[in-house]
Each structure stands twice: as structure tokens, then as C-alpha cells.
Regions:
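Tandem repeat scaffolds
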Residues: 17-146
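Sec-dependent signal peptide recognition
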Residues: 2-11
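Hydrophobic membrane-targeting alpha-helices
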Residues: 12-16
């Protein structure tokens, strides 16, 4: 199984996409994955800690309990992704798009989220209001009215 995950990582680095891959618990820590496509893939429990994910596309991906701590994911798309219990501590998420994503129990502690796309429902179902989120003024009124 370890060799399969290593081969998948080599494929990723060469072709910037995952096609019908199952990469549960894969480790992408500190990797440059800018512009990669992870659409509709099962990446549950995967770790992207410190990864460079600018404009990466996670649309429709299963990212339950994934770790994005300290990741740089400006412009990343998480449209329709399942991110329940994921962590974005200290992540840069400027212009990240979370439309229709499931964010139950997601942590955004000290995340930078200027111009990120989040709905009121997503803010209330995540731990957003409990976390100190940097530059999230446009969301603050939603937390006050819980």
C-alpha cells in the first residue's frame, strides 16, 4: 500500500491531477500542488499541512478530517466538497470558494479568509464563530446572530 501511495504522489507531481484515485490518509505536507485537480476524489484524513495549494481544485472531493493547517490555499475551490471535521488552522484562504461544501465541525483557527465564499449555514455549522479568524469582518455579523 505504501508503494501505491508513493506511485500516486509521483503521478501527481508529473501530471497535476488525480484521476479516479483513492488517497485516504495520504501525506501531501509541504508539497507544491498549485493548480492541481483533486475533483471528486476520496482524500479523507489526508494531510496538506504547509502545502502550497493556490488555485487547487477540490470540487466534490471527500476531505473528511483532512488537515490543511498552515496551507497556502488562496483561490482554491472546495465547491461541493465534504470537509466535515477538517482543520484549516493558520491557513491562507483568500478568495477560496466553499460554495455548497459541507463544513460540519471544521476549524478555521487563525485562518486568513479575505473574500472567501462561505454561506451563513456553513459558518454556523463549522467552528468558525468559536475561532479567532483573521480579517473575517464580513462574517462577524453572522456569528452575532446565531
Amino acid at each position: 500500500m505504501i508503494y501505491l501511495k508513493f506511485a500516486l504522489l509521483i503521478w501527481l507531481l508529473l501530471y497535476n491531477t488525480i484521476v479516479n484515485a483513492n488517497c485516504v490518509s495520504c501525506n501531501f505536507d509541504n508539497k507544491n500542488l498549485a493548480n492541481f485537480e483533486f475533483k471528486n476524489q476520496n482524500l479523507s484524513n489526508a494531510s496538506f499541512q504547509g502545502a502550497y495549494l493556490v488555485n487547487a481544485d477540490f470540487s466534490g472531493a471527500k476531505l473528511t478530517s483532512a488537515i490543511f493547517d498552515d496551507a497556502y490555499a488562496n483561490g482554491a475551490s472546495f465547491v461541493g466538497a465534504q470537509l466535515d471535521n477538517a482543520s484549516f488552522r493558520n491557513a491562507e484562504l483568500e478568495l477560496a470558494n466553499f460554495q455548497n461544501a459541507s463544513l460540519k465541525g471544521v476549524t478555521f483557527e487563525s485562518a486568513y479568509m479575505v473574500h472567501a465564499e462561505l454561506s451563513k449555514r456553513q459558518i454556523l455549522e463549522s467552528k468558525f464563530c468559536d475561532n479567532a479568524v483573521k480579517d473575517a469582518m464580513k462574517f462577524s455579523s453572522m456569528c452575532k446572530n446565531q
